[in-house]
Every structure is written in structure tokens, then in C-alpha cells.
Amino acid sequence: MLKVAINGFGRIGRNVLRAVYESGKHQQIKVVAVNELAQPEAMAHLLQYDTSHGRFGKRISHDQEHLYVHHDACPQGKGEFDSIRILHLSEINLLPWRDLEVDLVLDCTGVFGCQADGLEHIKAGAKKVLFSHPGASDLDNTIIYGVNHETLKAEHNVVSNGSCTTNCIVPIIKVLDEAFGIESGTITTIHSSMNDQQVIDAYHSDLRRTRAASQSIIPVDTKLHKGIERIFPKFSNKFEAISVRVPTVNVTAMDLSVTINTNVKVNDVNQTIVNASQCTLRGIVDYTEAPLVSIDFNHDPHSAIVDGSQTRVSNGHLVKMLVWCDNEWGFANRMLDTALAMQAAQ
């Protein structure tokens, strides 16, 4: 049993805890603690009720020091439950990971992300750390599960799980490159609104993000091309990316265009994705040609879902694809996959 602590109980932290149970991985992963500055009542409420993902199928209760995940659904049930320690500490070095015998910290704060931050968790008693965002370049490894998780080694103690968008697009790039050879590419990320945007116009260091999230399509900076280069160094300076935020609360679409070496048709491209989704990337990549819209991919655990009806090929070598992902739920599930891969690499 892998003993895990979650540092930061926001969108990703709560989805990670929920995914432990909904994926069936509670047989392999035990969440022993959650560190979050918010009050226990709010933590329990937002875990139980979620605007994007609906009501959690497990009953949640709490006291001032614990969250309880009940195995039964009855409001008055006295049956079995899992107890999770609640902490409210802002300094990593004060966290009682040693006393709690924590094997792995899932750091979902989005604040910490360099080697020194990870080592602080380890000094506090954790054995390993997995960050929920790309983090700094000095980490022991960056894992996009399904693509390079087999590169994990026992000595990789401070690891990044990449970003939701790298987890979405990197597996597709891998498939296309292995099948046809990629020369270069561009990506437009069409991303749901996030909590770094404003409900109504208000001050922000990024002037575009001073504007109300629900009223505009808002261009934002992205370092996605750097994330691709970190996984595939051979694509240094070969990809560029832009990103816009749209007025939805969840699910992201990625418009991928690549120039390839092989002369192909649409069916060649789509069949390659289908084959990967049924074999090497099963559970990571999915494929559909159904006439779906973004909300249909809400709560989908795959990293990427290719909409084959939108695949286009120009002059045999320019390929355009539309790739969907639930930027919260898919990523949370990959956090768990990577966590178990880190354990297996011991």
C-alpha cells in the first residue's frame, strides 16, 4: 500500500483524492493526510459537491482534524470509513510526513515546483514527491504517463507530472512521429477558464486576465512548447503554441497541426490513433468520430481523446487534428498512475 499525502486541496488535489476511489486505486493507494489552509467544513463540502464533476459517490464527513470517506452511502451510516488527517501548514518543513510515514507527497499547490521544494518535503520525512505542474528544469524527471514513465528510476525522488496539456498532446505527438515522422508543428490550446481569472473585471498583472472570464475568449501565455521539448529534446525549436481561455468551467480542446515526412491520407492518420488507443496507449488515448461537444468529455479519465471526424490532411504532409481532454479529471488520474509507477521503480 502506497501511503500518500496531498499538499494543496484545490481543483487538482480534490480530484486526485476522488480519483483514488472512483478508479479503484484505493486498494493500492492510501491517502493519509491533506494539507490545506482552508477550513475543514469547506474542504469536505467541495469534495462532496463539485460543479464540474457532480456529487462524489462516497459520503464525506469531517471534524476539525480529519476528513472521513465513508464506505457506505447512508447519511446515518455507522459503517467503515477511511480517516484522512487535515493539516493547515504553510511551511513545508513543518509538515509531519515522518510521523505519518508518508511514502509520496502529491504536491498540488501549484506554488512549489523546484528541486529545493521537493527536498524540503523529503527532509520533513516523505520518501518522494510528485508535482502537479511542469515545475523547474532541475527536477529528477518529468513524466507523461504512457510516453516515458518507464524512464523512472529508484533515485528519481522529485518528479513532475507535467501539465494537463502536455499529458493531452504529447502522446499524440509520439504516435504521429513514430508512424510518419514529424518535422514541426503548431498547437492552439482552447482551455476552460481557471481560477487565476476574474469573475468581473479586476486587477491582474496580465492585462488580458483583468477581464471577466465569462464574457470573452482570452489569450494567455503558454509554455507548452517547452513542455514538449522537455519530453522530446529532438523537437527543440520545432513546435510553437498559443493558448486561449474560453467561458466554460472544464474540458479543453487542442488544435494540433504538424508537418510530417510521409505522404498520408486522413484514414492513415486516424487508423494510427485507433491502433494506439487499443494497444500501447490503451486507457491513455481514446478515439471517437461521434458528433460530440466539450461537455461530453467531462469526467473522462483519458489523457487525450482524438475526434477523428475533425482530422484534416493538406497536400499529403500537413496534418490537423482536434484533441479533447478533461483538464482536471484526466490529469488527476495520471497523477495516480505516475505515483504507482514511482513506487514500482523502487
Curated annotation (Swiss-Prot):
Example GO BP: pyridoxine biosynthetic process
Binding site for substrate: 163-165, 209, 222-223, 245
Record site feature (Activates thiol group during catalysis), residues: 191
Keywords annotated in UniProt: Cytoplasm, NAD, Oxidoreductase, Pyridoxine biosynthesis
GO cellular component, one term: cytoplasm
InterPro entries recorded: E4P_DH_bac, GlycerAld/Erythrose_P_DH, GlycerAld_3-P_DH_cat, GlycerAld_3-P_DH_NAD(P)-bd, NAD(P)-bd_dom_sf
GO molecular function: erythrose-4-phosphate dehydrogenase activity; NAD binding
Record text on subunit structure and interactions: Homotetramer.
Descriptive protein name: D-erythrose-4-phosphate dehydrogenase
Binding site for NAD(+): 11-12, 327
Location relative to the cell: Cytoplasm
Species lineage: Bacteria, Pseudomonadati, Pseudomonadota, Gammaproteobacteria, Vibrionales
Reaction equation(s) it catalyzes: D-erythrose 4-phosphate + NAD(+) + H2O = 4-phospho-D-erythronate + NADH + 2 H(+)
Ion transport among keywords: no
